[in-house]
Structure formats: C-alpha cells, structure tokens
C-alpha cells in the first residue's frame, strides 16, 4: 500500500494490481498517493502526522486494520531492531526471510520478517528481499517515507511514498 493509506491493494494475476477499495485496475503512482510531495509541515497541517512526526492512527494501516494498540513501527524502532539484534537469513514454512534475534537485554526476543516486497518495487527479486513501511516520513525528501530494507544489506532507508510496500504491525 502507499504510505499514509489504509485501504491497501492486493495482487491480481490477470491485471496487475487491483485496489481492494474499489476493485478497479490500479497502478502505484505519484498521482494516486495523497501524501506524495508534501513536506512534514503540510503532512501535519493536513492531519497525516502528529507532533512526534509519525502517522496518526487514522492514516496508520496497522491501526486501521487491527485496532489499537497495533501500529506501524517508527524508523527509530527499526534502527533499534538493527542495533539490538543479530540477523539470520532463513526460511519458515517455505517463506524466505530474516530472523531477528535479540542481544543482551533483548536476548529472549525474536521476530521473523518475511522477504516480501510491494507493488511498484519490481527491481527487487521476489523472495530475496523485503521492504517494510515505517510510520515516519523521510525528513529530507517530501516524496519519501522511511522503510526497513532487507536485501543484500539490512538497514533503515526510504522509498517513494507511492510505492506499494508492506506493513509489519507492532504493539
């Protein structure tokens, strides 16, 4: 789904991407992403982000679908995950991904992140990488939002807000 949207999209083998909202042919683009090109001041003024600089519940896909306290993680939480875990490329139930295992005070925690990418990121090989939205817009680019990138590298990055990335809810 595009960043700041809550209705989502699903794959359709015959016609590409189909919007769940209206079930018509759909393509991720700048024109159909309401947050694209808006700086943080505009996002805050229009009610997309709060005083902390993260998506409000009404525009948080995890909260919209699962209810509170579920939400999208922030880029700071993605950075903490990277800094406090070891990561191992593995497979669970036939799905490739990264197993994040906590270190130190977090040693009893782990999370599996499937290697999945969204709609407009066809340059990344399926089943070999993952791109997950954060709730944080990129502060230096009014067209981007923060992501957790799982590819040859494992890092916090950014992606065009209209890209169809996936959401990994947290609480």
Regions found by a protein language model. Give the residues of each.
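Conserved positions within compact, well-structured domain cores
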Residues: 1-171
